[in-house]
């Protein structure tokens, strides 16, 4: 057998007695695959034994103390040479140990140290069953790729403030215990620089050389797993909580207080549609905590202390904060709703803030940089951290809370073991000092999910339906993802609940009393259920269809060539906003006489864009509001539009919104300036906005220089002549007959003495509807139109 496959045997003093030995008794086949030169141990395959001489000890064995401290430090079970000749034994078919035969040791006994007895839950004089163990056999232990151990001083009365070199400790540990078997949870005491160090195996990762090469080893804390320590095993030490032991900052090994949970996987987070946001948060806030402290010290940087998550309601801000707490190997996060901080007693609100940081301060004083991470999560942060000086009242409680939070996060006594996560829907209300680097420096907008994100969310929320066979095959998740534009994650969850309610309702007997039908096993959620749910659940940041459709009740009548040209020009602006790389904002003014159809045309262009966000701003929605409330309302609509990738805002009758009247004249300059600013304000990167505004007072807007705020202007004229009037009244039932229309138009021309009309289309349609109620429709229509046509 090639001697390179022999592993060192432990001497009585716990050191290699000879460089190589046969791993098992018996003979080996000369045809077995052996190692080749220039191959690492993990690339080689050991030769396989042809037969094994395994002796089964008879009768139970009794647990006794190890013979000496030196023997206890070998991590071996002391046995009699008359009982065992093998190096490994398995006790009660669960714990594997290396053995050390000691002449004169009583037969039928196992000498176990205190760590052995603690790990195996043994009592002195306890009877156990023992068998030989073959780590190289088909059911043996694989080789350890890596192992993490938690260390502390065994004797709390004999410690030192001198930091230990973790790499030096790992080399000594590897050489002292090479070829021994280790499992998660196993306890061991070893000597390092004359100090007894107590270690507990936390996780291991194994590589089985017999079945594959270069396999990706995964860390596991499963106590049933075990592996064989080799000279190539990577060993990492982490100090125990509240331990006085100190480890030097390493340039190659991670921090001693690991930031991530063992075995953490990103795919287990269960966050749909937020992959890029979560990756950015991890890169900015946690990546530096994974690197060795020595490397971080060399860079001279501090870890990120605060993250601000902002965005519309229901988009997953709280979910990300909750999942971050699960991901990190830290204490249970302190979750605080903003208003809970406030208290009616003087000074108590500030005291509540100090209490949140008390544990972190205490541990940082005791352990310094070795302190564990403390996470504090503030929900509805804008409730307690408004801009200082903006709150009403003379108590100043809000300002004092902000001051206290600023001091705790980045004051004179800085803490480097905290992570504050704030969540809000109103980032604009947060005090600027809290948003600077050193405090809540990572600002992450959790916006509405795109189509790919919505598909992920739909799959997550319907996974249980699909796995249980309740989801019909006709449900296409990709179709639903395309139909749920601007739906937040919470609204998608509501959509699925609504679809389920339709499925439930099909199995309810409606009579004198509601009862469930017997065929419950046939409950299925199908495509029609989701389509019905889409008519019930509307996104908060979606299309104001009812408002806009009410402006185009009868549709658009192409009574003249200019109407088609206006629609075509409007479509060009829509395509410009959607596709142009240079213009993310386009504002268009539709001007014309009263009742000329400006609002209907603007609404038609907006609805035809099929943008996910379409809103109407009109004076109707602001009735009863004072000036400040109107400004806030208009600003809120524009802020909401910035949350959608593609948006259209229809601003109807600007002169009514700004309270303009010709007598005086009078108007609200605050509203005027607000609109002029918002019409020119560029949306954030990745967001596009089309503004369609209407006015019947273009001359007034020109005098106010407001027309300069628009990129383009479209004139919407009145109905000019009887030819255009004929095309309009064709759509009215009472004038469907061509002879009736010809008679009507001739009588109108005779009445007015001209073929000119110059009346708005909306006014004409209103006159026609009124005339339909009269017995003599034609006469009523002609008389009303004659009064409406302006006389020259």
Curated annotation (Swiss-Prot):
Give the source's domain of life in one word: Eukaryota
Q: Give the classification, highest ranks.
A: Eukaryota, Fungi, Dikarya, Ascomycota, Taphrinomycotina
Keyword Nucleus attributed: no
**Binding-site list for ATP:** 311-318, 592-599
Q: Residue positions of the PTM Phosphoserine? A: 58
Q: Name one GO biological process term.
A: endoplasmic reticulum to Golgi vesicle-mediated transport
**Annotated positions of the Phosphothreonine modification:** 252
Locate the region Disordered: 1-46
Which regions are flagged for Polar residues bias? 26-41
Organism encoding this protein: Schizosaccharomyces pombe (strain 972 / ATCC 24843)
Output the Gene Ontology terms for molecular function.
ATP binding; ATP hydrolysis activity
| Short name of any one Pfam family annotated for the protein | CDC48_2
Q: What is its main location?
A: cytoplasm
Role according to the record: Required for vesicle-mediated transport. Catalyzes the fusion of transport vesicles within the Golgi cisternae. Is also required for transport from the endoplasmic reticulum to the Golgi stack. Seems to function as a fusion protein required for the delivery of cargo proteins to all compartments of the Golgi stack independent of vesicle origin.
Q: Which UniProt keywords apply?
A: ATP-binding, Cytoplasm, ER-Golgi transport, Nucleotide-binding, Phosphoprotein, Protein transport, Repeat, Transport
The cellular component terms of Gene Ontology attached to this UniProt record, alphabetical and capped at eight, are: cytoplasm; Golgi stack
InterPro entries for this protein:
AAA+_ATPase, AAA_lid_3, Asp_de-COase-like_dom_sf, ATPase_AAA_core, ATPase_AAA_CS, Cdc48_dom2, CDC48_domain_2-like_sf, CDC4_N-term_subdom
UniProt keyword Hydrolase present:
no
Say which family it is in: Belongs to the AAA ATPase family.
Q: Where in the cell is it found?
A: Cytoplasm
Protein's recorded name: Vesicular-fusion protein sec18
């Amino acid at each position: 057998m090639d001697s390179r496959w022999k592993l060192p045997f432990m001497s009585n003093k716990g050191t290699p007695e000879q460089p190589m030995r046969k791993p098992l008794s018996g003979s080996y086949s000369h045809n077995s695959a052996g190692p080749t030169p220039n191959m690492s141990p993990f690339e080689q395959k050991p030769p396989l034994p042809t037969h094994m001489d395994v002796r089964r000890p008879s009768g139970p064995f009794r647990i006794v103390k190890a013979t000496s401290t030196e023997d206890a430090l070998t991590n071996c079970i002391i046995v009699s040479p008359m009982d065992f000749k093998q190096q490994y034994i398995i006790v009660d078919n669960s714990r594997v140990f290396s053995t050390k035969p000691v002449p004169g040791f009583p037969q039928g006994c196992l000498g176990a140290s205190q760590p052995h007895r603690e790990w195996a839950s043994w009592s002195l004089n306890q009877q156990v069953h023992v068998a030989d163990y073959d780590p190289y056999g088909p059911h043996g232990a694989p080789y350890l790729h890596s192992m993490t151990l938690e260390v502390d001083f065994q004797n709390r009365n004999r410690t030192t403030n001198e930091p230990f070199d973790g790499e030096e400790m790992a080399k000594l540990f590897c050489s002292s215990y090479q070829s021994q078997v280790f499992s998660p949870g196993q306890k061991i005491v070893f000597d390092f620089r004359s100090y007894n160090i107590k270690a507990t195996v936390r996780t291991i990762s194994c590589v089985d050389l017999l079945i594959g090469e270069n396999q990706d080893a995964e860390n596991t804390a499963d106590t049933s797993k075990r592996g064989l320590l080799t000279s190539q095993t990577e060993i990492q030490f982490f100090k125990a909580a509240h331990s006085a032991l100190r480890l030097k900052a390493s340039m190659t090994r991670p921090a001693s207080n690991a930031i991530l949970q063992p075995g953490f996987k990103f795919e287990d987070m269960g966050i749909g549609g937020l992959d890029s946001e979560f990756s950015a948060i991890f890169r900015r806030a946690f990546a530096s905590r994974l690197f060795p402290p020595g490397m971080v010290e060399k860079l001279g940087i501090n870890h990120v202390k605060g993250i601000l998550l902002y965005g519309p309601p229901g988009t997953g801000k709280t979910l990300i904060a909750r999942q971050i707490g699960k991901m990190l190997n830290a204490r249970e996060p302190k979750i605080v709703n903003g208003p809970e901080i406030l208290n009616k007693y003087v000074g108590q609100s500030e005291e509540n803030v100090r209490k949140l940081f008390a544990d972190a301060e205490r541990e940082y004083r005791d352990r310094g940089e070795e302190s564990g991470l403390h996470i504090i999560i503030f929900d509805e942060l804008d409730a307690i951290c408004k801009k200082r000086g903006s709150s009403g009242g003379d108590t100043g409680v809000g300002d004092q809370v902000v001051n206290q939070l600023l001091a705790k996060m980045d004051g004179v006594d800085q803490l480097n073991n905290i992570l504050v996560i704030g969540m809000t829907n109103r980032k604009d209300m947060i005090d600027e000092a809290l948003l600077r680097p050193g405090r809540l420096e990572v600002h992450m907008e959790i916006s509405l999910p795109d189509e790919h994100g919505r598909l992920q969310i739909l799959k997550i929320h319907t996974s249980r339906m699909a796995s249980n066979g309740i989801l019909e095959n006709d449900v296409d998740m990709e179709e639903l993802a395309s139909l749920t534009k601007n739906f937040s994650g919470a609204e998608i969850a509501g959509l699925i609940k609504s679809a389920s309610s339709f499925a439930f309702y099909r199995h309810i007997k409606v009579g004198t009393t509601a009862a469930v039908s017997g065929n419950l096993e046939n409950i299925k959620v199908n495509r029609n259920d989701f389509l019905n749910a889409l008519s019930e659940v509307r996104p908060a940041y979606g299309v104001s269809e009812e408002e806009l459709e009410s402006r185009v009740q009868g549709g658009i009548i192409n009574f003249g060539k200019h109407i088609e040209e206006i629609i075509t020009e409007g479509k060009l602006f829509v395509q410009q906003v959607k596709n142009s790389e240079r213009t993310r904002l386009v504002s268009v003014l539709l001007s014309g006489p009263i009742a000329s159809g400006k609002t209907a045309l603007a609404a038609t262009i907006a609805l035809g864009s099929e943008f996910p966000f379409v809103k109407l701003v009109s004076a109707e929605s602001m009735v009863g509001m004072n000036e400040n409330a109107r400004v806030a309302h208009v600003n809120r609509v524009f802020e909401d539009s910035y949350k959608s990738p593609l948006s259209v805002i229809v601003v109807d009758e600007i002169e009514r919104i700004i309270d303009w009247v010709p007598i005086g004249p009078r108007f609200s300059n605050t509203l005027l300036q607000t609109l002029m600013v918002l019409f020119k304000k560029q949306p954030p990167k990745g967001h596009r906005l089309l503004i369609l505004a209407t006015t019947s007072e273009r001359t007034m807007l020109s005098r106010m220089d407001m027309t300069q705020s628009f990129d383009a202007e479209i004139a919407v004229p009145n109905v000019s002549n009887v030819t255009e009037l004929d095309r309009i009244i064709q759509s009215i039932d009472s004038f469907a007959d061509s002879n009736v229309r010809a008679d009507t138009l001739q009588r109108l021309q005779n009445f007015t003495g001209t073929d000119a009309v110059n009346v708005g289309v909306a006014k004409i349609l209103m006159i026609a509807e009124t005339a339909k109620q009269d017995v003599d429709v034609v006469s009523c229509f002609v008389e009303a139109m004659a009064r409406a046509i302006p006389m020259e």
